Amino acid sequence: MAKTLNSICFTTLLLVLLFISAEIPTAEANCDTYLGEVTVYYPCRERDCEAQCYEHYPHSCKGECEHHDHVVHHDNEEEHCHCYGR
């Protein structure tokens, strides 16, 4: 009886651990939808970028300072703040 109970508890614990570990990477990986671009002062800082993203796009989950391909878009070296959401 005790071995059966221990086996059931171990199996249940293993399943719970599996469900939790499978959910964590998917929650972090879903922040990849481009929402738009916001203006920040040069030089672009991640903290300022994330604050501006949250202000303009309340459902944003991250903001990143990124370089554009300046041959096509601009003549000067410039970083832009891109906002991403789920």
From Swiss-Prot:
Disulphide connectivity of cysteines: C44-C65, C49-C81, C53-C83
Signal peptide: 1-29
Cellular location(s): Secreted
Alphabetical keyword list: Antimicrobial, Disulfide bond, Fungicide, Plant defense, Secreted, Signal
GO cellular component: extracellular region; secretory vesicle
GO biological process, one term: killing of cells of another organism
Similarity comment text for this entry: Belongs to the DEFL family.
Identification of the protein by name: Defensin-like protein 205
Organism from which the protein derives: Arabidopsis thaliana
